[in-house]
Amino acid sequence: MVGNNLNLKPAKYDASSIAKYLLSLDPNREYFENKRAKNEITSATITTGNFRLNQMLYLIQILYYLKYERLLFNDKFYAWENGMVIYSVYTHFSSLYYNVNGKNIKNIEDGRIKTFISKCFNYLKTNSDRVLQEFAFTDPVWTSTWGRSSQPEVNFTDKENIGIYRQCCSR
Protein backbone atom coordinates (compact mmCIF):
# COMPACT_ATOMS: atom_id res chain seq x y z
CA MET A 1 0.00 0.00 0.00
CA VAL A 2 1.95 2.93 -1.31
CA GLY A 3 1.20 6.27 -2.92
CA ASN A 4 -1.17 8.67 -1.23
CA ASN A 5 -1.72 6.33 1.72
CA LEU A 6 -2.57 7.78 5.05
CA ASN A 7 -0.20 7.20 7.95
CA LEU A 8 -1.48 3.99 9.46
CA LYS A 9 -0.84 2.48 12.86
CA PRO A 10 -0.13 -1.25 12.83
CA ALA A 11 -3.26 -3.32 13.36
CA LYS A 12 -3.54 -5.50 16.43
CA TYR A 13 -5.03 -8.51 14.62
CA ASP A 14 -4.71 -10.25 11.27
CA ALA A 15 -7.57 -11.03 8.90
CA SER A 16 -7.57 -14.73 9.81
CA SER A 17 -8.18 -13.88 13.48
CA ILE A 18 -11.07 -11.60 12.54
CA ALA A 19 -12.41 -14.27 10.15
CA LYS A 20 -12.26 -16.91 12.90
CA TYR A 21 -14.10 -14.58 15.26
CA LEU A 22 -16.77 -13.91 12.62
CA LEU A 23 -17.17 -17.66 12.06
CA SER A 24 -17.56 -18.14 15.82
CA LEU A 25 -20.57 -15.81 15.70
CA ASP A 26 -22.27 -18.37 13.44
CA PRO A 27 -21.61 -21.65 15.30
CA ASN A 28 -24.29 -23.61 13.42
CA ARG A 29 -23.05 -22.29 10.06
CA GLU A 30 -26.46 -20.98 9.09
CA TYR A 31 -24.88 -17.94 7.43
CA PHE A 32 -21.33 -19.02 6.54
CA GLU A 33 -22.36 -22.14 4.64
CA ASN A 34 -19.76 -24.37 3.03
CA LYS A 35 -21.82 -25.00 -0.08
CA ARG A 36 -21.26 -24.27 -3.73
CA ALA A 37 -23.70 -22.02 -5.53
CA LYS A 38 -23.94 -20.11 -8.77
CA ASN A 39 -23.36 -16.40 -8.37
CA GLU A 40 -26.46 -14.51 -9.55
CA ILE A 41 -24.48 -11.70 -11.16
CA THR A 42 -21.35 -13.32 -12.63
CA SER A 43 -22.67 -16.90 -13.05
CA ALA A 44 -19.42 -18.15 -11.50
CA THR A 45 -19.59 -21.00 -9.00
CA ILE A 46 -18.69 -19.79 -5.51
CA THR A 47 -18.53 -21.19 -2.00
CA THR A 48 -21.26 -19.15 -0.35
CA GLY A 49 -19.64 -18.87 3.08
CA ASN A 50 -16.26 -17.92 1.63
CA PHE A 51 -17.83 -15.19 -0.49
CA ARG A 52 -19.81 -13.84 2.47
CA LEU A 53 -16.82 -13.93 4.80
CA ASN A 54 -14.58 -11.98 2.42
CA GLN A 55 -17.25 -9.40 1.60
CA MET A 56 -17.97 -8.97 5.29
CA LEU A 57 -14.27 -8.52 6.10
CA TYR A 58 -14.05 -5.80 3.48
CA LEU A 59 -17.09 -3.91 4.71
CA ILE A 60 -16.03 -4.23 8.35
CA GLN A 61 -12.56 -2.92 7.46
CA ILE A 62 -14.11 0.16 5.81
CA LEU A 63 -16.50 0.83 8.69
CA TYR A 64 -13.81 0.30 11.31
CA TYR A 65 -11.43 2.66 9.56
CA LEU A 66 -14.08 5.35 9.21
CA LYS A 67 -14.98 5.11 12.90
CA TYR A 68 -11.51 4.73 14.46
CA GLU A 69 -9.18 6.07 11.73
CA ARG A 70 -7.06 2.93 11.84
CA LEU A 71 -7.18 -0.47 10.20
CA LEU A 72 -8.67 -3.44 11.99
CA PHE A 73 -6.12 -5.68 10.22
CA ASN A 74 -3.28 -5.08 7.72
CA ASP A 75 -3.93 -7.90 5.25
CA LYS A 76 -4.28 -6.83 1.62
CA PHE A 77 -7.52 -7.00 -0.32
CA TYR A 78 -7.74 -7.93 -3.98
CA ALA A 79 -10.48 -7.08 -6.48
CA TRP A 80 -11.68 -10.35 -7.95
CA GLU A 81 -14.54 -11.31 -10.21
CA ASN A 82 -17.07 -11.76 -7.39
CA GLY A 83 -15.96 -8.88 -5.17
CA MET A 84 -13.19 -8.31 -2.64
CA VAL A 85 -11.01 -11.07 -1.20
CA ILE A 86 -8.17 -11.47 1.23
CA TYR A 87 -6.08 -14.14 -0.42
CA SER A 88 -5.11 -15.95 2.80
CA VAL A 89 -8.74 -16.12 3.99
CA TYR A 90 -10.04 -17.07 0.54
CA THR A 91 -7.56 -19.92 0.04
CA HIS A 92 -7.81 -21.25 3.61
CA PHE A 93 -11.57 -20.98 4.00
CA SER A 94 -12.08 -24.72 4.53
CA SER A 95 -9.53 -24.94 7.33
CA LEU A 96 -10.93 -21.79 8.93
CA TYR A 97 -14.45 -23.17 8.55
CA TYR A 98 -13.77 -26.56 10.14
CA ASN A 99 -11.20 -25.57 12.76
CA VAL A 100 -13.14 -22.83 14.45
CA ASN A 101 -13.71 -23.48 18.12
CA GLY A 102 -12.91 -21.58 21.27
CA LYS A 103 -9.41 -23.06 21.54
CA ASN A 104 -8.32 -22.20 18.00
CA ILE A 105 -9.56 -18.62 17.88
CA LYS A 106 -6.83 -16.08 18.51
CA ASN A 107 -8.14 -14.17 21.47
CA ILE A 108 -9.63 -10.87 20.56
CA GLU A 109 -9.34 -9.35 23.98
CA ASP A 110 -10.53 -5.85 23.19
CA GLY A 111 -14.23 -5.76 24.08
CA ARG A 112 -14.76 -2.69 21.91
CA ILE A 113 -13.47 -4.55 18.85
CA LYS A 114 -15.56 -7.64 19.61
CA THR A 115 -18.68 -5.49 20.02
CA PHE A 116 -17.94 -3.62 16.80
CA ILE A 117 -17.48 -6.84 14.82
CA SER A 118 -20.58 -8.44 16.36
CA LYS A 119 -22.75 -5.43 15.52
CA CYS A 120 -21.46 -5.37 11.95
CA PHE A 121 -22.04 -9.11 11.57
CA ASN A 122 -25.60 -8.89 12.87
CA TYR A 123 -26.38 -6.08 10.45
CA LEU A 124 -24.55 -7.38 7.38
CA LYS A 125 -25.90 -10.93 7.62
CA THR A 126 -29.38 -9.55 6.91
CA ASN A 127 -28.25 -8.50 3.41
CA SER A 128 -28.48 -10.86 0.47
CA ASP A 129 -25.40 -12.07 -1.39
CA ARG A 130 -26.50 -9.93 -4.31
CA VAL A 131 -26.50 -6.78 -2.14
CA LEU A 132 -23.03 -7.62 -0.80
CA GLN A 133 -21.73 -8.12 -4.32
CA GLU A 134 -23.43 -5.04 -5.74
CA PHE A 135 -21.70 -2.98 -3.06
CA ALA A 136 -18.35 -4.23 -4.34
CA PHE A 137 -19.32 -3.71 -7.97
CA THR A 138 -20.42 -0.13 -7.35
CA ASP A 139 -17.50 0.64 -5.06
CA PRO A 140 -15.20 3.05 -6.96
CA VAL A 141 -12.18 1.39 -5.35
CA TRP A 142 -13.17 -2.02 -6.80
CA THR A 143 -14.11 -0.65 -10.21
CA SER A 144 -10.86 1.33 -10.52
CA THR A 145 -8.83 -1.75 -9.54
CA TRP A 146 -10.61 -4.67 -11.23
CA GLY A 147 -9.08 -5.79 -14.49
CA ARG A 148 -5.61 -4.23 -14.05
CA SER A 149 -3.94 -7.57 -13.40
CA SER A 150 -4.73 -11.14 -12.46
CA GLN A 151 -4.69 -10.23 -8.74
CA PRO A 152 -5.16 -6.47 -8.46
CA GLU A 153 -4.40 -5.18 -4.99
CA VAL A 154 -7.00 -2.79 -3.61
CA ASN A 155 -5.59 0.42 -2.16
CA PHE A 156 -8.58 1.48 -0.11
CA THR A 157 -6.49 3.59 2.29
CA ASP A 158 -5.58 6.06 -0.43
CA LYS A 159 -6.76 9.53 0.68
CA GLU A 160 -9.07 9.82 -2.32
CA ASN A 161 -10.68 6.45 -1.61
CA ILE A 162 -11.17 7.20 2.09
CA GLY A 163 -12.83 10.46 1.02
CA ILE A 164 -15.27 8.49 -1.14
CA TYR A 165 -16.16 6.21 1.78
CA ARG A 166 -16.63 9.15 4.13
CA GLN A 167 -19.01 10.77 1.63
CA CYS A 168 -21.03 7.58 1.25
CA CYS A 169 -21.30 6.99 4.99
CA SER A 170 -22.34 10.55 5.75
CA ARG A 171 -25.55 10.19 3.75
Where do the language-model regions lie?
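Domain-edge interaction signal
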Residues: 1-171
